[in-house]
């Protein structure tokens, strides 16, 4: 099963929309088994990954809400299906902002409450793609396989892919 809606093609599309080129330094926040990390490295990026429960020796073990990296040390942050399950997505955005260099790029795809405006404090939104239909298919497959995080009842969600630039 793909670890996020759209799989590798979606990761490559986010990268393209970001405008980042190798050898830019990119951190995968919530890297899991390291599939996107391996893809980034294969593309020529200087990439690192962090996850609470890494499933690859290439991924550092740690809490990305308090990542053990210097401020302003990355050109890009990639996160797919990770900020929502962190329990504090807004803290995750703040940490991403801390880690990015001025003008650095955030490549984000995750669930988003339908009632919330598409705005991320400290970032200028550059592109937004609503991937909700693809996410629904992915979510059904995850439920079938017993590999999903339940969503709160009474709220509506959509799945967005966003590229954003850190405000200076």
How would you name each of these model-derived features?
Residues 126-168:
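Conserved Class I S-adenosyl-L-methionine
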């Amino acid at each position: 099963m793909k670890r996020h809606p759209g799989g590798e093609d979606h990761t490559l599309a986010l990268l393209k929309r970001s405008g980042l080129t190798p050898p830019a330094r990119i951190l995968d926040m919530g890297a899991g088994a390291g599939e996107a990390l391996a893809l980034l490295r294969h593309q020529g990026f200087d990439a690192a990954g962090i996850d609470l429960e890494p499933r690859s020796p290439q991924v550092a073990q740690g809490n990305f809400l308090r990542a053990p990296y210097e401020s302003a040390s990355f050109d890009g942050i990639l996160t797919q299906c990770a900020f929502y399950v962190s329990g504090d997505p807004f803290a995750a955005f703040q940490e991403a902002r801390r880690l990015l260099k001025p003008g650095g790029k955030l490549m984000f795809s995750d669930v988003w409450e339908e009632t919330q405006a598409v705005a991320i404090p400290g970032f200028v939104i550059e592109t937004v793609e609503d991937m909700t239909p693809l996410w629904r298919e992915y979510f059904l497959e995850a439920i079938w396989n017993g590999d999903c995080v339940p969503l709160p009842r009474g709220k509506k969600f959509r799945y967005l892919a966003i590229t954003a630039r850190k405000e200076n």
